[in-house]
Amino acid sequence: DNYTVRLIQKDLPCSVVFYLGRGDRPYRPTSISLPYNTSISLLSDHFTVQCNDLLKRTSLPTVPYISIRYDENVRQRLATTKKNPDNFNILILGLDSVSRMQFERMLPKTFAYITKELDGIILKGYNILGDGTPAQIIPILTGMQERELPSTLHRDKNGSFVDVYPFIWNQYRERGYVTGYAEDGPSMGIWTLRLRGFNRTPTDHYMTP
């Protein structure tokens, strides 16, 4: 809690491994021992915990976690941004490889939670503008199709990183918002499978180490 991780169980020494880096470059694991009843500040939004059971003399499975680290730059931005009661918290949720109608049929509880509990808006008129996941997501996040943007392909030796795209979160950041981006499968990432990925971390909180 409070941007820290704490060990509250005896006879269970643990190590926390933070993953430091930027953009889609290889991340550097940094391990820190976590003694009983102590806490350490989060160094990254994503980390793993490895513990040893001294009584059973066994190692427990490594557990991954996602949290929000303290970021002074973000705090300064929030402190200097004029508060507007009309501003919304905005979450864009995309599900790949499934149509809207199939989503409603196959995941009715999830659909009901999004539409009723969260009062979410379903983009009924949204259509893919090409083939593949990038053709699904690039237009809604940039307002342009991939062919209208600078080349970011791996095979293009003069290609740019996808940082050059006019992502909508850049505009939100300029207006004082805290931004974030996450994918469930970074090994097959939208921006890295056939594109060059990000050179710099694109959002305040980037959940794809």
PLM features: residue spans?
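Beta-strand-enriched, solvent-exposed domains that form extended recognition/catalytic surfaces
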Residues: 1-81
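Active-site-proximal alpha/beta segments of enzymes that process anionic O-linked groups
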Residues: 44, 74-78, 82-209
